[in-house]
Amino acid sequence: FMLRGFFYTNLNYKGENMERALKKYFVIFALPTLIAFAISFLIPFFLGIYLSFTEFTTVTNSTWVGFENYKKAFVGNPDFLNALWFTLKFTVVSVISINLIAFIFALLLTRGLKGTNIFRTVFFMPNLIGGIVLGYIWQIIINGVLLNFGVDITFSAKYGFWGLVVLMNWQLAGYMMIIYIAGIQNISSDLKEAAQIDGANSFQTLMNVTIPMVMPSITICTFLTLTNSFKLFDQNFALTGGAPAKQTAMLALDIYNTFYGRIGFEGVGQAKAVVFFIMVALIAFVQLYITRRKEVES
C-alpha cells in the first residue's frame, strides 16, 4: 500500500513538473506561429488601414490626406454604389438558391437511393475547380447559348447577373450539400419515428424535426455562401469583367479596377477595401448571431 502511494505521489510530482515546464516554454513554442501571423496578417492589415488615409504610389511614398479617399469612394462615384447594389442583390439570390438546392439534394441523397456515393462525388467536384477557370468555362457555355439569339453575356447586365448566379450555384451547391448530408445523418431515427407515431406527415416531420435539428449545418452553410458570394472576384473577373459598362462589376472587382486601373487612386482603392472588409465582417457577424439564436431556440 505504501509502495503504491509512493508511486502515485511520484507520478503526480512528475506531472506537475511537466505542466510547469510547458507553461514556462509555451511562449517559445508559440512564437514562430505568432510571428508568421503578424507578418502575413496583422502588419498588412494595419498598414492597409493607414494607407487608406493617404495618397500613395508605393508604401514608402505616401502623403496623409485624412478622410479624402473615403469621400472620393462614395461621393460622385456611381461605380462603387452600383457595385454595392449589384453585390447585395447577387448575394441575396445566391445564398437562398444555393442553400435551397443543396438542402433538397441532401434530402434526396439520404433516402437510401442506389448510387448515392457517386452522386455525392459528382455534385462535389465543381468545388475543386478554380474560380478563374470556372468563369471562362461558363462564359463559353453561356455565350454558346446566347449567340443563337444574336447576343452574348456582356450584352445586358441581367445576363451577367444570372450567369454569375448559375455559376455560383454550380460551384457551391455540392459542397453545401455534403454539410447538409452530415447534419441530416446525425438526426436520431427515434425522433422521426416519434413524429410519425404522433401522426406527422412528411412535410410536418421536415419542418418540425429535420430543419430544427440541422440548424448548425444551416448556420455553417449560410455563413459560407454569404461570405463567398459577397467577396466574389475570380468568377466575376473571368465571366463578365464587369461588362457592360461596369454594370456587372461586384465590389471586389470595383476595388481592383480602382486600385490598378486609375493612376493616383491607389488610396481610394484602399479606402474601398477597408469599407468592404467592415461590411463583410458586420454582415457575417449579424448572420451568425441570428442563426445561432435559432439553434438555441430549436
Q: Where does each model-flagged region fall?
A:
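A structural signal for multi-pass alpha-helical bundles of membrane permease subunits
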Residues: 19-298
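Short, Lys/Arg-enriched N-terminal segments with co-localized hydrophobic residues
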Residues: 1-17
